[in-house]
A protein has these predicted regions:
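Conserved P-loop NTPase "ATPase switch" module shared by AAA+ and STAND
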Residues: 4-26
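C-terminal boundary/linker of central alpha/beta nucleotide-binding cores
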Residues: 90, 124-204, 212
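Helix-turn-helix DNA-binding segment
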Residues: 647-697, 701-706, 713-716
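Extended alpha-helical scaffolding segments used for macromolecular assembly and cargo binding
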Residues: 208-283, 290, 299
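Alpha-helical sensor/transducer elements of the RecA-like P-loop NTPase core
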Residues: 12, 28-94, 104-109, 194
């Protein structure tokens, strides 16, 4: 090289598989070779990886890396033009993202008309060009990383430490297509195509290979606080011990590949070996809470009994106290009986509960306390007093886990009774108490209460402020971010507001959290399912609404307490009335008026009184509930805004809604109106006097009168 060969001749020194001998080349030699610019000597290195070579420190070096062979967005557009295909920039970016710019795969996409390529073709190409050429040990490492879109150096070290050291893994990865190393962030990014292929290979691998990958992935997620992802990974291989080893907090109603958390809890109950369950009693109690929250009452009871046997064997008073906190739901919503469990827990526990912490939503994420605990007519106020006492005890055991709940119940009760000033005070008390202790469900409940209260008073400015508060991401609790429960609680508030203010465009959107189906009804979604019913009614699907509501009345009363029943009966009254069945409408309205009479629960009926008004004239209703009907009519409350869809319920003259008289009844009524006695009518119509008397009773009831002198005017 130093002999300075003649100008007309050149020396090419090619060193292949440089990665094998790189350690034998001192850096000074490489620097010397790179300084031969302008000579006839050309040195070419070929390697599957230059990962450890500081090329940027070498002078006069030209190099081509694997990234140079990948097509950029602009390259893909030019490639497509050569094939006579016109691509938009957006299409090119999509193809680049999907293929990583690997030319062979870009070509497949373009040949397929820029549509998604059949997975069989992609898989075969990956198999031929990439997978078959890799060593088994590298395949094993890649399958462990298949769950991640990006992996940093520490993740590679942890997940592959038994396969090779970090340096060796780095050299392997550097040589792989579709795996990009971000030196600045020190992480690897798996192209979507590579990740999809690896997941496909993993899905079709042996169970031992799957276990190796998913178990290690689950352990990584668990140790880094990503519990939901950890549970999903462990469940892939039915690793029940792995699931129970996680801190199963804040997972209520989450989905794992379309499987609910409750279903996973049920599987653990049925299939997890007892020796595994015995190692994780706290996790069993958390699963009990999840089962009850999702209305799986039978499974809750079974697992609760198993957990008690395990805990009693351990002789841990604090753990037994935790069991009592969970066991209290056996007697839900009986506050007095629940209180007995809390008292026993108080005697056992020497530290705050480790189950009912900030991250575990209070009372299943239900945002209404009176929908849970108002269960007996005539006991609205007494329940408020009991709840206040019980919550004080519960909060002492859980470091304030239920803060604001008692105030929320009182505020809801006041709002329902039309005591709007008191309701606002309690609403703010509940809001600030819950914010202090991060009790999310009470926070949302207080927002709903304050907004509803503002609507009832006609203060739309105040109502819109609550809506702004709800929509501001800054007010979302960090531990609830991206959870299904947060979506459900927000949409419960939004959908209730949409029912009260149907003209508000901000609330006209598709709801994600619940459907009209009843088979998956639970404490959290029952409210949102309920307030969807008016949407069905507004579309005039009265028979469908009646079917749903009638079935709902037969559901376990733990899920459908008095406030829910009030809502259901009100809607049933409107629906039956709309299809011309006034008698059935009156039966359901009587429930509403009876509750209003006993506990002064007037606001809901008063808000819809414009549409209920015709029903107030029904004879069976007007005579029995005249006083409470007058209270509903006179309550100072804003009426629901008129919308075209509600025109079916627009009030008309009262006699238009009376039950029609039969031909015989009208005949007898007209004769009686002319002053004929019962005997004279009987003789004229050739019927008995008793028959005349019975027909007149029916006429009086239908026309809502109590004397014969009123007949002429009513008939007219």
């Amino acid at each position: 090289m130093h002999a300075k060969p003649a100008e007309e001749s050149s020396l090419y020194l090619m060193i292949d598989n440089f990665q094998v001998i790189a350690a034998q080349f001192p850096f000074s030699v490489l620097q010397l070779l790179s300084a031969l610019k302008g000579t006839a000597v050309h040195v070419i290195f070929l390697s599957r990886s230059f990962w450890q070579l500081p090329i940027q420190d070498l002078m006069h070096v030209c190099y081509i890396s694997k990234e140079d062979f990948f097509l950029r967005k602009e390259d893909i557009i030019c490639f497509a033009e050569e094939l006579g295909i016109s691509l938009t920039e957006k299409q090119a970016m999509h193809i680049q993202k999907e293929t990583g710019g690997w030319a062979a795969f870009v070509s497949l996409y373009l040949q397929n008309g820029c549509e998604e390529v059949e997975w069989e073709k992609l898989s075969r190409l990956m198999e031929d060009l990439f997978w078959r050429r890799q060593e088994d040990i590298l395949k094993k490492a890649l399958l462990r990383l298949a769950q991640f879109e990006t992996v940093d150096v520490e993740m590679v070290r942890t997940l592959t430490e038994d396969i090779a050291d970090l340096k060796q893994m780095g050299e392997w990865f550097y040589s792989l297509p579709l795996l990009h190393y971000d030196a600045e962030r020190q992480r690897y990014c798996l192209c979507a195509l590579l990740r999809e292929f690896l997941l496909y290979r993993l899905h079709n691998a042996s169970f031992l290979t799957q276990w190796d990958s998913y178990h290690r992935c689950g352990c990584w997620y668990r140790e880094h606080g990503e519990t939901k992802k950890a549970v999903a990974a462990f469940y892939k291989v039915l690793d029940y011990a792995g699931i129970l080893s996680c801190d199963l907090t804040g997972l209520l109603f989450e989905k794992f590949d379309k499987l609910s958390y409750t279903e996973i809890a049920g599987e653990i109950l049925r299939h997890c070996p007892m020796e595994t369950k015995q190692r994780y009693p706290l996790s069993l109690l958390r699963l009990c809470y999840a089962l009850f929250a999702d209305a799986a009452f039978t499974e809750y009871q079974q697992l609760l009994e198993e957990a008690k046997d395990i805990i009693c064997d351990g002789n841990d008073p604090n753990l037994l106290g935790e069991w009592e906190l969970i066991a209290a739901f056996q007697d839900f919503p009986n506050l007095e009986k629940m209180e007995q469990h809390y008292q026993r827990a108080k005697r056992l526990m020497t530290a705050p509960s480790v189950i009912f912490t900030v991250g575990e939503p209070f009372l299943f994420g239900s945002i209404s306390m009176w929908r849970l605990f108002y269960t007996k007519p005539g006991e609205l106020e007494r329940t408020a007093e009991t709840l206040e006492r019980v919550m004080q005890l519960y909060n002492s055991l859980t470091a304030g886990h239920g803060s604001g709940a008692a105030e929320l119940y009182r505020g809801e009760a006041c709002c329902a009774q039309g005591r709007f000033a008191d309701a606002e005070i309690y609403g703010y008390q509940a809001l600030y108490a819950s914010l202090q202790r991060k009790n999310a469900c009470v926070t949302y409940g207080a927002v709903l209460l304050l907004g509803t209260n503002a609507v009832y008073r006609g203060d739309l400015a105040a109502w819109k402020r609550t809506l702004d508060y709800l929509e501001d991401p800054a007010h979302t609790y960090a531990f609830l971010k991206d959870t299904f429960l947060d979506v459900c609680m927000k949409e419960t508030v939004q959908s209730y507001f949409a029912m009260l203010q149907p003209k508000e465009s901000r609330l006209r959107k598709r709801l994600q959290a619940a459907s009209n189906r009843l088979y998956d009804l639970n404490f959290t979604n029952s409210a949102i399912k309920g307030v969807r019913i008016p949407r069905i009614i507004l579309k005039k699907n009265y028979h469908k609404a009646i079917g749903i509501l009638e079935v709902a009345l037969k559901i376990d009363t733990r899920l459908i307490a008095l406030p829910s029943q009030l809502f259901i009966h009100t809607n049933l009254a409107l629906c039956y009335f709309a299809i011309g069945r006034s008698r059935k409408a009156a039966e359901h309205l009587e429930f509403v008026l009876s509750l209003a009479e006993r506990d002064q629960v007037l606001s809901f009926a008063a808000y819809f009184r414009e549409y209920l008004e015709p029903l107030f004239y029904l004879p069976s209703v007007s005579r029995k509930y005249a006083a409470v009907i007058q209270e509903i009519r006179s309550l100072p409350i804003q009426n629901i805004p008129a919308v075209p869809e509600w025109k079916a319920f627009t009030p008309k003259q009262e006699n238009e809604w009376e039950e029609p008289l039969s031909k015989r009844e009208r005949e007898i009524a007209e004769l009686a109106a002319r002053g004929l006695r019962n005997g004279e009518i009987a003789e004229m119509l050739h019927i008995s006097e008793g028959t005349v008397k019975n027909h007149l009773k029916i006429v009086f009831r239908k026309l809502n009168i109590d004397r014969r002198s009123s007949l002429r005017g009513r008939l007219r």
